[in-house]
Structures are given as structure tokens and as C-alpha cells.
UniProtKB/Swiss-Prot annotation:
Keyword field contains Chaperone: no
Alphabetic keyword roster: Cytoplasm, GTP-binding, Initiation factor, Nucleotide-binding, Protein biosynthesis
UniProt-listed InterPro entries: DNA-bd_dom_put_sf, EF-G-like_DII, IF2_assoc_dom_bac, IF2_II, IF2_N, P-loop_NTPase, Small_GTP-bd, T_Tr_GTP-bd_dom
Biased composition, class Basic and acidic residues, residue ranges: 48-63, 120-181, 213-264
Protein name stated in the entry: Translation initiation factor IF-2
Function: One of the essential components for the initiation of protein synthesis. Protects formylmethionyl-tRNA from spontaneous hydrolysis and promotes its binding to the 30S ribosomal subunits. Also involved in the hydrolysis of GTP during the formation of the 70S ribosomal complex.
Length: 976
């Protein structure tokens, strides 16, 4: 019925009339009672108010969703050849939104585009569905129907649950209503009783009030218990019912899933297995065979495809498998001779089925392209290979160098994978490129394998085993004493006096540039001396001397004190743990001050014995011989304290003090024997060099047959010049020495190449950052390796950010034609240190214009290279102010611009000078003079006190009162 008043409208809305009146009042509709009339306008105002207050959206815009279904049928033949009809259903969901009138045109266009896209999408999906339908079979349709049935059952279950929930809520509401009614009745009874008792007994009001409270609480508890019991019973019933329904649904779902799983397995099973399943059973074979025998024709019993392949090998090798009667039936015994490998077959086996990729029918187990000779060789198990699901982690032994291809082979992956990982790491490599050990281990770990640093098949392990096995008798040996100190402090002169020789007088420049080894016989025994250079360039030589020594004589000039190389010698001695004997030389000079030297040495940590230290200080003079005996006494005393011993009757071991390339003798090495005895004819190994000792000379150049511990000798017969500081060891077999030397050469070469390759990118980036850097290429040839090493290091230290020394090649020996050819190709300068070029090399150098420089003092070589580098530096530009000009008047000349009439106030103005324009002592322009005139004549210069006319290139903003600062730019040569 129509709701014409408030009460009827409240009944229609199923809400109290009082609440509706309050909402109408809030909406601005004034209604006093339930009987007041209510118009449609009032209802609309109430609806707007409720939408605004509850956050409802504008009702004008509405959204409509349409779902369209399109069903089509596709006919497809299955594996058995039967035609099956497959229904394809395409569902499409479309949403329409009502928009404003202003955007109707745009909406129509958008709708048209949407329709076109929808049609295209529909066609695409139909095509996809048709392609997918080709792979579907009848079981897929049955699975979809079961899933729909499950969905319907799930929807029914949800409906039942919602009904149970509604029933439970209704029961709770009834229980709450009953509880409220009981509470109201109890409260009314309590109030009546209280009124009666209050009228009768005013004095016991407080006690009666407490009784009323207790009664009210008891009534409320009773009502609550009753309501809770009812609600609990209803909830229990609903829960039992829901649990039963869920259990039933779960069972149905599990059954449906099991059935779907079986269908999927059946669909995924190869068709060969399905063909096997429909083959005739075995019991039917025997009657067929008997019938065939009755006809007089021999037949083999038909076998399944799987058994035929297994039966043939058994027939060939009866001893390897089951007994022969089990593998071949009785029909094989009657086989005709010459029938070949295949034998007789029954009619069913001769009728071959259609050849398909997944099916090999006809009882013959062949592949897709199996030939007549390959029958029965390929089993079904060959096609059932399962790829490993987990990645295989391998332990990869990485040597010091390895190529990319070998590294990939060790990890059982393609080389392209290793190249990809290297590209991700920022390095481009090829398949044959050699990687160093560190880079290769990082690549292995990036690919998920374990990298182990490998030292496999190292022939040097034999040397370690030989060291462990040597247990010869230890006998006393002479001490090895190294003389160290600053340059020009008298080390060689001191040794000359001890040896009664004059080595210092024959040295170039009066300075030692080689390490010398001598042994001196004294009344108290033999002492071996090593004389080291004091120049700063020979740091490596001094370090080798300290490594091979037992005692260090530190020579300090009494008039010079502690110098940089003195401090370096102290640090070398302390690093080697070698005792120091200090010789304060040149005490015969008037300016000598030994006490000052002692104080400086104490500051460096060398404390004399009189100050409580452990270093003897001996004042000596290499010229007069004062204190030489005391020095030797202290040295031998230190040697006795050290108790130096070494095995004598054992293969020799030592260290290379110096090495050089002699044109007549070949590679020559000065060796200090540290243990054992070195004999002529022994096979020695020194670093990458090996050979048999052909000749052995002492320090005086006299031949000797053997050298014991602490004796220096010069040996010949090595394959190449060994590195200074290399360990020398005697081996029993030349073949083993060659093997170890070649192994070291290959390892050194591979490591060097790998490091060069790793540093290529960095050096390229450095060169890009440096920009234009001048290079001074040099080829260095020296007489001995120590001098060559020192010269190379000294020259490399001269490099700056603008000029860099590039050592193209450095070696020991004379200058040959190959060196000149290398210098021609690299445009290098050849430096010969105590060496000369042969006749052919000199002619070739003159023809090609190659500069060859000879030096015998390291100072001169370093100074001349430094001067050449200074000449390669870009000159420095300096500005020199030559004059000041004041503008007195400005003239505007057509086609010329502004011309300033000026007065030269200071210096001179030249036509070729540059100029700065100053206005209020602020530079506003810098440029060049365009013209300089005096009385309409061009002049080259104007001196102070004269007037002139000037114009400036590309500048016309000249004002009276401006000043011109005239300057010239000069280039000044720079020095390092």
C-alpha cells in the first residue's frame, strides 16, 4: 500500500516511527507526530540526507555489467580415428557506465573502439580456443562437467550455511528479547516489593535494597544461563550440521580430484602404452599356435612390443639371461636355416600399423626413423630419461692459469656461459683467452660451483722432498759479511785495504755499481765479504746482500753522518735479523766528529756497546789502516757467538749474487754457496735457468774445482741469464732440472700474460683519463742484471703526469741488431750501460737514425734522460705587461668602428701586442690590436708620452676614460 503518513512509511521500512521522525527532523522535514502526512518530496529530501550522511555516491551514475556467452563446436579426430565433437564456450564480460551528457560523444567513440577491440579479442580468443581444442579429448569435457558440479554443490553448501547463520541470528535475537522481558519483570517485582517494604519498614531500607540487588542479579544470571544454553544448543546443532556438510563436500572433492588426476595421467601417458593395453591376452596365444601348426605353416607366437625387444637379446645370448625355453617358445626350434636374424613372424606381426611419432605398432620396437637393421635395439627405457631436477655442484680445481674453454669443460657447461659471466663482470674474453687463477675462481663461484686452488703435477715438490731428506753432518763455516752504507762513505776502500787490493780506483766515477763477493783468509779464519753499492738506485742489490749475509758492517763517514742509504741499510739488516758492526770511517779527516755519528745512530735504533747496546762501534780509516784489525776482531767475535754451521758433504745450495751475459762465455752467474759443496760438472738449477757447470772461477779469476759453504764463485754453462737473488740448487739429473725450469718458464709466462690481460682495461681507462701524455721509449742494455734492474727502476721513477718513461726492452749483454730493429719499430732510444754495440748493430743504427747512448755512471744516465724529458714538456706561457694607455677621445669611423685616440702613459705599445680594456679598474674585454696609427700612418710601436690611434678587434664599446693594458705572451721552457 502507499505510505501516506509517517507511521505507514516506518512500517514499510521496518523501523521504529520515533527513529524515522528523528531522521526526518535531521533532513529538514518538520513532522510532529506519526500521523502527519508524508509527500514524495519529503521522501526525496530524506533520501538525499541519508546518502550524504552515509557517504553514498551520486545515484545518477550507474554501472551495468553484461556477460555474453558464445558457444561453438569443433570436430576433431582422435588417435583411434573416430570423429569427436568438442564444444567451445567463450565468455565475455562487458561493463557499461552512464556518463554525463557532455562526454556522450567521447563515450560513443570509446565504445566503438572498445567494440572493435572486443571483436578482435573475440576472434583471437576463438582462434586460440580452436588451437587448444585440437589437443583436448572427451575426458577434458567430463572433467569440466565434474568441476561445474562441484561448484554447484559448493554454492548449495554456502546457501545452507547462510540459512543456518540466519537461523542462529534469529535464535539469538529471540533469546535476547526473552532475557530483556525477564529482566523487566524482575525489575517491576523488585520495585513493587521495595515500595511495600519502604512503606512498612523505613528503618530497614538499606538491607532490603541489598536484597533487591541480589534478587535482580540472580534473575539476570538465570536469564543469561537460559539464553546461553539455548544459543549453545543452536550453535552446536548448526556446527554439527556444517561439519557433516563439509566432510561430505571434502569427500566429493577428493573423489573428483582423484578422478581428474587419473584422467590427466591417462592423457599424459604415451599412446604406445594405450596400444599395449588393448592387445589380446597371452592365454589366447597357445590355441592360435596350435591351429597354425595344424595348417602346416610355422609361426612365431605374437608378443607384445615390449617383450619382443627383450626376447631377441635373450635368444642371441642364452647364457646371460633366463633359460632359453623361457625366452623363445617351442616354435624357434623348428626355425628354417638361413632365415636370418629376425626369424619367422606371425600374421599379426607382419601387418604393421600406421607409423606415428608416438606409436610403434606391429610388435616391432622401432624408433621414428628406425631402419630394418636397428629393430629391437632401442628400448622404451631410452626415451624415459629424467633430467636432474637439482643443480649439480662440482668441485673445480683451478690451476694458476686456465683458458676459458678448459674452465667451461671442467664445469661441464658451454664456453659461451663462461663468456656471458665474464661480460657481466665487465670483461670481454674469447674462448681461447687465458685467465689467472683469481679471476677463474670468481667465475666458478658465480656459476654455483666450488672453486679449489689446484697445484697439480708440480715438479717443484721434488725439491721440497729433497730438502726434507737431507741429513748430512753440520760443520762450522766461514761468516758472510756484507759491507753496507751511504754512497762515498768508503765501503770499497775499506775492503780494498782488507784485501790489499785496489778495486775502488778502477771503478767508474769512484762509486760501486756492482755487488762484489770476496773471501779473505785471516789468522783467525776465512771471512767472506759482500760489497754492495751505496747509491739509492741499488736498493734491490742491498736487499739481496742483506738476505745472504750473517753479519753487516755498517760504514758511516765521520764527517758526513747518517744519510738516507745508511737508514735503508739499517732497515735491511733489522728485517733480516742480522747483527750490525758499525765502522766509523774517515776519522783521519780534520772535520770528523764520531760522537755526532753515534748520537745519530742511536736515534735510528743502533745503540753502541758503551751505551748498553749490542752493536760494536769501531773507528777506522781506510787510508791509514787505523782500526782495521779491531774491526776484523769484532766481526769474528760476532761469528763465534752465532756458531755458524752448514753441511759440507751434500749437494750444494746457494744464491745468485750477480749475473751477466758474456759474449764469449755466455751466461755467467756469481753464486754464493750457502750449504754443501759445488763441484765442476754438477747440474744446477737457478730459477728458470739450468745447466751443467762447465767452468768455475774464484773472485780473482782463477779456475777452481769445488766451492764449499760461504765461498763465492763464478759459474758458466747455464741455459740463460738467471735472475739476481734466485736460489741455486744442485740436482742429480739434468732431465729433472730441465723439466722444472720449463715448468717455471711456462708458469711465469702464463701468469704474466694473465695479469697483463686483466690490467688492459684499467690501463686503457687510465690513458683515456690522462689524455695526451708524452712517452719516452727506451731500450736498456747493461753489463750485469743488478745494474740493469737498478737503472730501470731509477728511470721509471722519473715519470710524471705529462711525460712518461716507457721501457720497451731491458736485458743483459751487448747491443745487437735485434735491439736496433726493435728501437726502429718502437722509435726508442738505446741506452748502453757498460756495454757497447757490435759493428753490424752500429751500421744498422746509423742507417735507421737510431740514437745509441753509452754510460758507465748511473748518475749521468739518469740526468740525461731527465733533460730529454724536460725538452718534451709543453712550454709554460707567461704574460708580460709592456705598457698602459689612456683613452682621451673616441672617433666613430664608417666601416671601421670605434677608434680610440690615446696617450701612452707607461711603457711601450707594439702592433703585435694583446690588450685588456679596463673600465673603472675592472677588466671588461681581452683581445688583440686591430690597428696602431700615428698621424694617419701605421706604426709598429709607440713609446711613452706620445699619442696614437688604436682600434681593437671585435670590440667597439670604447668610452673616454678607459684604460688599455698592453701585454705580450711569452713561452718559457719547463724543467722537471
Amino acid at each position: 500500500m502507499a505510505s501516506n503518513n509517517v507511521a505507514q512509511f516506518a512500517a514499510e521500512l521496518k523501523m521504529p516511527a520515533g527513529v524515522l521522525l528523528e531522521q526526518l527532523q535531521a533532513a529538514g522535514v518538520q513532522k510532529a507526530s506519526e500521523d502527519d502526512a508524508l509527500s514524495e518530496t519529503d521522501k526525496a529530501r530524506l533520501l538525499d540526507h541519508l546518502r550524504k550522511s552515509h557517504g553514498a555516491t551520486d545515484g545518477d551514475k550507474r554501472k551495468i555489467t553484461l556477460t555474453r556467452r558464445h558457444t561453438s563446436e569443433i570436430k576433431q579426430a582422435d588417435a583411434t580415428g573416430k570423429a569427436r565433437t568438442i564444444q567451445v564456450e567463450v565468455r565475455k564480460k562487458r561493463t557499461f557506465v552512464k556518463r554525463d551528457d557532455v562526454s556522450e560523444t567521447g563515450a560513443d567513440q570509446a565504445q566503438a573502439q572498445t567494440d572493435e577491440q572486443a571483436e578482435a579479442e573475440l576472434k583471437r580468443r576463438e582462434e586460440e580456443a580452436r588451437r587448444e581444442a585440437e589437443l583436448l579429448e572427451k575426458q577434458a569435457q567430463e572433467l569440466r562437467e565434474r568441476q561445474e558440479r562441484l561448484e554447484r554443490e559448493e554454492a548449495e553448501r554456502r546457501a545452507r550455511e547462510e540459512a543456518a547463520e540466519a537461523e542462529r541470528r534469529r535464535a539469538e535475537e529471540e533469546a535476547a528479547a526473552k532475557r530483556e522481558a525477564a529482566a523487566a519483570q524482575a525489575e517491576a517485582a523488585q520495585q513493587a516489593a521495595a515500595a511495600r517494604e519502604e512503606a512498612q519498614r523505613a528503618q530497614s531500607e538499606q538491607s532490603e535494597q541489598s536484597a533487591q540487588d541480589e534478587a535482580r542479579a540472580a534473575a539476570e544470571r538465570a536469564a543469561q544461563r537460559e539464553a546461553a544454553k539455548k544459543a549453545e544448543d543452536a550453535a552446536r546443532e548448526a556446527a554439527d550440521k556444517a561439519r557433516a556438510e563439509q566432510e561430505e563436500i571434502r569427500k566429493r572433492r577428493e573423489a573428483a580430484e582423484a578422478e581428474a588426476r587419473a584422467i590427466r595421467e591417462m592423457m599424459n601417458t604415451p599412446r604406445r602404452a594405450q596400444v599395449k593395453a588393448v592387445e589380446p591376452p597371452k592365454p589366447a596365444e597357445q590355441p592360435a599356435a596350435k591351429a597354425a601348426e595344424a595348417k602346416g605353416t610355422l609361426h612365431k607366437p605374437a608378443k607384445p612390443a615390449g617383450e619382443a625387444a627383450a626376447a631377441r637379446p635373450a635368444a642371441k645370448k642364452p647364457a646371460s639371461g633366463a633359460p632359453a625355453p623361457a625366452a623363445a617358445p617351442a616354435g624357434d626350434r623348428n626355425k628354417k636355416p638361413g632365415t636370418g636374424k629376425s626369424g619367422w613372424q606371425d600374421d599379426a606381426a607382419k601387418r604393421r600399423g600406421i607409423k606415428t611419432r608416438g606409436d610403434s605398432s606391429g610388435g616391432v620396437d622401432r624408433g621414428w626413423r628406425g631402419g630394418p637393421k636397428g629393430r629391437g635395439k632401442h628400448q622404451d627405457s631410452a626415451s624415459s630419461f629424467q633430467a636432474p631436477t637439482e643443480p649439480i655442484v662440482r668441485e673445480v680445481h683451478v690451476p694458476e692459469t686456465i683458458s676459458v674453454a678448459d674452465l667451461a669443460h671442467k664445469m661441464a657447461i658451454k664456453a659461451s656461459e663462461v663468456i656471458k659471466v665474464m661480460m657481466k663482470m665487465g670483461q670481454m674474453v674469447t674462448i681461447n683467452q687465458v685467465l689467472d687463477q683469481e679471476t677463474a675462481m670468481i667465475v666458478v663461484e658465480e656459476l654455483g660451483h666450488r672453486a679449489l686452488a689446484a697445484k697439480l703435477d708440480d715438479p717443484e715438490a721434488l725439491l721440497v722432498e729433497g730438502e726434507i731428506g737431507s741429513d748430512a753432518e753440520q760443520l762450522p763455516r766461514p761468516p758472510v759479511v756484507t759491507v753496507m752504507g751511504h754512497v762515498d762513505h768508503g765501503k770499497t776502500s775499506l775492503l780494498d785495504y782488507i784485501r790489499r787490493a785496489k778495486v775502488a780506483a778502477g771503478e767508474a766515477g769512484g762509486i760501486t755499481q756492482h755487488i762484489g763477493a770476496y773471501h779473505v783468509e785471516t789468522p783467525r779464519g776465512v771471512v767472506t765479504f759482500l760489497d754492495t753499492p751505496g747509491h739509492e738506485a741499488f736498493t734491490a742489490m742491498r736487499a739481496r746482500g742483506a738476505k745472504a749475509t750473517d753479519i753487516v758492517i755498517l760504514v758511516v763517514a765521520a764527517d758526513d753522518g747518517v744519510m738516507p742509504q745508511t737508514k735503508e741499510a739499517i732497515s735491511h739488516a733489522k728485517a733480516g735479523g742480522v747483527p750490525i758492526v758499525v765502522a766509523i770511517n774517515k776519522i783521519d779527516k780534520p772535520e770528523a766528529n764520531p760522537d755526532r755519528v753515534k748520537q745519530e745512530l742511536v736515534a735510528e735504533g743502533v745503540v753502541p756497546e758503551e751505551y748498553g747496546g749490542d752493536s760494536p762501534f769501531v773507528p777506522v780509516s781506510a787510508k791509514t789502516g787505523v782500526g782495521i784489525d779491531d774491526l776484523l776482531e769484532n766481526v769474528l767475535l760476532q761469528a763465534e757467538v752465532l756458531e755458524l754451521k752448514a753441511p759440507v758433504e751434500s749437494p750444494a745450495k746457494g744464491i745468485v749474487i750477480e749475473a751477466k751475459l758474456d759474449k764469449g762465455k755466455g751466461p755467467v752467474a756469481t753464486v754464493l754457496v750457502q750449504s754443501g759443496t759445488l763441484n765442476r760438472g754438477d747440474v744446477v738449477l737457478a730459477g728458470t735457468a739450468y745447466g751443467r757447470v762447465r767452468a768455475m772461477l774464484d773472485e780473482n779469476g782463477k779456475p777452481t774445482k769445488e766451492a764449499g759453504p760461504s765461498i763465492p764463485v763464478e759459474i758458466q754453462g747455464l741455459s740463460e741469464v738467471p735472475g739476481a737473488g734466485e736460489e741455486v740448487i744442485v740436482l742429480p739429473d739434468e732431465r729433472k732440472a730441465r723439466e722444472i725450469a720449463l715448468f717455471r718458464q711456462g708458469k711465469f709466462r702464463d701468469v704474466k700474460l694473465a695479469k697483463q690481460q686483466a690490467a688492459k682495461l684499467e690501463s686503457m681507462l687510465e690513458q683515456m683519463g690522462e689524455g695526451e701524455v708524452q712517452n719516452l721509449p727506451l731500450i736498456i742494455k747493461a753489463d750485469v742484471q743488478g745494474s740493469q734492474e737498478a737503472l730501470v727502476q731509477s728511470l721509471l721513477k722519473l715519470s710524471t703526469n705529462e711525460v712518461r718513461v716507457q721501457i720497451v726492452h731491458s736485458a743483459v749483454g751487448g747491443i745487437s741488431e735485434s735491439d736496433v730493429n726493435l728501437a726502429t719499430a718502437s722509435k726508442a732510444v738505446i741506452i748502453g750501460f757498460n756495454t757497447r754495440a757490435d759493428a753490424q748493430a752500429r751500421k744498422l743504427a746509423e742507417a735507421n737514425g737510431i740514437d745509441i747512448r753509452y754510460y758507465n755512471i748511473i748518475y749521468d744516465a739518469v740526468d740525461e734522460v731527465k733533460a730529454a724529458m724536460s725538452g718534451m714538456l709543453a712550454p709554460e706561457k707567461r704574460e708580460v705587461v709592456t705598457g698602459m694607455v689612456e683613452v682621451r677621445q673616441v672617433f666613430k669611423v664608417p666601416k671601421v668602428g670605434a677608434v680610440a685616440g690615446c696617450m701612452v702613459t707607461d711603457g711601450v705599445v707594439k702592433r703585435s701586442s694583446s690588450v685588456r680594456v679596463l673600465r673603472n679598474n675592472v677588466v671588461i674585454f681581452t683581445g688583440e690590436l686591430d690597428s696602431l696609427k700615428r698621424f694617419k700612418d701605421d706604426v709598429k710601436e709607440v713609446k711613452q708620452g706620445f699619442e696614437c690611434g688604436m682600434s681593437i678587434k671585435n670590440f667597439n664599446d670604447i668610452v673616454e676614460g678607459d684604460q688599455f693594458e698592453v701585454f705580450e705572451v711569452t713561452e718559457v721552457a719547463r724543467t722537471l
